[in-house]
Amino acid sequence: MRSKTFSVLSSCLLLIATVQGQLSGSVGPSTSISDKKAVKTCNVLDYGATNDNKTDVGQPIMDAFEDCGSGGVIYIPDGDYLIQEWVSLENGTAFAIQLDGVIYRNGTTTSQGYMFGISGGSDFELYSSTSKGAIQGSGYLYHMNGEFTAPRLLHISDVSHWSVHDIALVDAPMFHFVIDDASNGEVYNMAIRGGNSGGLDGIDVSGDNIWIHDVMVTNKDECVTVKTGSHNFQIENIYCNWSGGCAMGSLGSGTNVSNIVYRNIYTWNSNQMYMIKSNGGDGEVSNLLFENFIGHGNAYSLDLDSEWSSMDTVDGDGIFYRNITFKNWKGTETDGESRPSIRVICPEATPCTDITIEDVDLWTEEGDSETYVCKNAFGSGACLKSDSSSTATYATTTTVTSAPSGYSATTMAADLTSAFGTDASIPIPTIPTSFYPGATPYSALAGSS
């Protein structure tokens, strides 16, 4: 919960962020928590919930929403709660959920879908006043049996002016947090921790005017990934701590993405520092900035791949990528010769234009050389060709045999030394206070005040 003074400071910081980044307007709830509490507080304990991890809290939350969903705060006090009935809250206005307890998925339920879904409406906030609230999905109970088509944890859909902050999402049976066609939102001060397997995405996001910052993700798939239909995003201070890494896609027919900034992204022992992935399709991706990236121990680094083999080819001449800048990248990857540290692969029928690779200094951890691969990509830097007016297609590989100056980069104290498996319970993490070397989080943890 933010004080009035802090709200003013946050607004000033947001103004700075809007000027420096790609946000198109204000983000977050329209009214404060104190204003919402002044209307009404609905304690789930008064609606039949008990914090004994035995009695379903899902229905009490939905019953509390009937009284507080048009103005007020649904309060889930400290303690352990069992969820059996999935929560679906639709078209609420001027309400919040204060999750100070921990919600555990009932391990015997076979329900699919989203455990916690908020759809429609506006002026919404999900937060923990102690920064200790969490949703524990106990996904390992599925994964240990080889099941990965399973419930998801949190879904924000078609909501305007909202925020999610100061909570942890843990061990999702499938995806952790999906933001779908939402607008004017803010996500911050979160820890997401999942099993070491594909399909356990951290944050997947689409919509307009969304600020995601100060988030740590551990899993084996998407860290913070932008989907088609995304515009005016600012994503910064992201800690992919043994993850799949951040990405865009996969993109197919009718792709429409513009005005996206990723800044201050730290990636440790993940699949990639950043990947844009498509295979065929059509549409346009434009006006992207990827600035201040640090990586260590990753399989791939800078990877724009319009021939991504992990997806089926989609009908179309390929997506048109234009005006994309990669700037100030440092660090290492595991094997820069067998997996190029810079790879920009663009469609033959729709070459990429206005691509800039500037101060991208990466080096291999194995061997003594690395490669850059470019195909049908025009701009400046690395192996890119400069003449986009040419109709000739091309493909080139450049071998680098000496480490670039300035590639060395710091590590983070919380870098994991091993992954979390898929056959045992995953502990709930403490939300960190640092998400990128030298960068101060925009908002102090709610529990620190």
UniProtKB/Swiss-Prot annotation:
Keyword Glycoprotein: yes
Major localization listed first in the record, in broad terms: secreted
EC number of this enzyme: 3.2.1.171
Reactions that this protein is recorded to catalyse: Endohydrolysis of alpha-D-GalA-(1->2)-alpha-L-Rha glycosidic bond in the rhamnogalacturonan I backbone with initial inversion of anomeric configuration releasing oligosaccharides with beta-D-GalA at the reducing end
Domain of life of the source: Eukaryota
InterPro entries: Glyco_hydro_28 (IPR000743), Pectin_lyas_fold (IPR012334), Pectin_lyase_fold/virulence (IPR011050)
Keyword set includes ATP-binding: no
Protein's name according to its UniProt entry: Probable rhamnogalacturonase E
Organism for this UniProt entry: Aspergillus flavus (strain ATCC 200026 / FGSC A1120 / IAM 13836 / NRRL 3357 / JCM 12722 / SRRC 167)
